[in-house]
Structures are given as C-alpha cells and as structure tokens.
Amino acid sequence: MPRKQMPNNSNRAGRVASKVQTLVAEILRDNYSDDKILSGVSLVGAVAHGGLQFVRLFYYSRDENIPAVQHRLDAVTRMVRFELAARMNQKYVPEIKFEYDDTLERASRIDALLENL
C-alpha cells in the first residue's frame, strides 16, 4: 500500500497573506472610506510570518504625512482584525501589522540619479 503524502504547504503562507491583504483592503474600503487619512491608503503587499500567526501588510499612501497615516492605521488595527475574523474561514486569525512601503519613493530617487548620469 503506497504511503500517503503530506499536502504541499510551501505556498500556504503566500495564500494566507494574499487573502488577508484582499480582505483588509475590502474592510478599509467598506468601513473607512470616509476617513480623510485612510481613504488614500492602498495595500500593496503582504507577508505571513511565524507559522501564519502574523501578517505584515505593506501600504502606500497619497498623504505625505506618513507618521499620521501609520498612527491612524495602528489605531484601527484591532477593529480591522475583529472584522477580518468575521470574514475569514480559519480557526485562527493572524495578528496584522501595517508597514509603509517606500518602494515608489526609492525608485523615483534611483531614476533621478540615473538621469543625472
């Protein structure tokens, strides 16, 4: 009798992170669209860590006052996670942390440097 193989979970973290990113984006759109600070936030990536216990959500904001945006996201994280638990089909809902993604700013600085060469 052949041995039963374990399912390949190598991409499970990516699937969970992607699902969390999609759901949190929906939650921000549905619940905070009239919030002046959060209405300009776009989630651009997610990474799961610690056996899927933590998900880092990377965001970009049109608002130039990133510390204010980060403070506002930190303030709503608990309510977002509560809403996330209601929308996810999982026994455990990961902790979430928002981090600013400065990739666009770095890319524009590199472009400016290359133009000056």
Regions found by a protein language model. Give the residues of each.
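Charge-rich, low-complexity N-terminal segments
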Residues: 1-54, 60-117
